[in-house]
Amino acid sequence: TRWLLSRGLGDVYKRQEYTWLRSLMDRHKDFWQVTEDSLDKSIKVFNIDPSMRNELLNLYKILSPYKEVPETLKTLKEKKFKLAILSNGTPSLLDELVKSNHLDNLFDDIFSIEQVGVYKPSSRVYDMPIKKYNINKSEVAFLSANTWDVSGGGNYGYQSIWVNRNNNIFDNLDFRPKYQITDLNKLIQLV
């Protein structure tokens, strides 16, 4: 299972494409269903033993943060920053991941696209924290490791920060992040 994920199966199995197509077609399914659909296609395309399906799906429920993340979040919380997650994930999965990683006391909010029924990079998603907190877009430091998400948040008006852990090349989406960092420790120096 780990070999499959290390070979990029997680990126290959069309999940992002499915979310974007569903958003464009106004045919919403929650992220867990989209994950299942895209994994089912990959199982066929890559001739993977179908009995591995549940094991592969369950890996999403045991994701762990990078080692510096909890301490960085604690530091930001001590500095009185409001911290939130803005994710395509389902509320139940996000809650499960946050609690299982003992991060639930660090976040003020968890925003799921399920609240608006469309996936990022729709501006309706990025608008959720703005509406709830009645703040200006430029007051939000928005971090992501995904260049499409950094571009979406930046295009919306957030101060986008790309977490580029692997020295990747930024996508050509007519947008550049305000900052690029290699891990969350670098964020403390920016705020």
Predicted regions and their residues:
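Alpha-helical elements of Rossmann-like donor-binding domains used by nucleotide-donor carbohydrate transfer enzymes
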Residues: G10, D37-K41, E55, E71, ...
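Glycine-rich active-site loop/strand segments that organize a redox cofactor
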Residues: Q16-Y18
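A metal-dependent, Asp-based hydrolase signature
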Residues: W20-N54
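Short, contiguous strand/loop micro-motifs
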Residues: D26, L59-Y60, F81, I113, ...
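Single conserved hydrophobic/aromatic residue that forms the stacking wall/gate
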Residues: T1-Y13
